Amino acid sequence: YLRERGLTTATQKAFRLGYAPDSRNALKEYLASRGVAKEQIEACGLVRHGDDIAVSYDWFRDRIMFPIEDRRGRVIAFGGRAMSPDVAAKYMNSPDTELFHKGDVLYNFARARAALGKEQAIIAVEGYMDVIALAQAGFANAVAPLGTALTENQMELLWRVSPEPVLCFDGDKA
């Protein structure tokens, strides 16, 4: 999928893109085998419980994974794009946690801020793939909200680093 979208291996590595296998418990079992406590696994939002089942399951399955970083570049959550066309939610994010509130974060903010020159404005685009494609084309100053709307908190982040941010969203209703 990533090659079909024109992303080079170097770009994929730079953005630390990954894949969540189509398994209900691969991540849960891997983390447990590494000694991570069940409570920690659940607190980070990567493993969930269903309303009607007691057994936990991996939140992301059969998805391209996009690490979401805080303002300092530390991974605090993930976004995932479904590989199957039959999945209702094409994109989904980690649930809100103690560290992550999707309305307060912009994808690629730390990198974009570091790339800003004196004359550059920060560019806000619609999604992960837009940000990554722009970076590969030489525009490292792009960010994206983590949903269908740009929140007030996200706008404040933009204005902190760029007095005239450029908004470049798709023309569709999504």
Where are these regions (language model features)?
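Phosphate-handling DNA/RNA-contact segment within nucleic-acid enzymes
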Residues: 23-165
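Short acidic/histidine-centered micro-motifs embedded in hydrophobic/aromatic stretches
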Residues: 1, 18, 44
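Non-catalytic interaction/clamp surfaces of large macromolecular machines
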Residues: 1-13
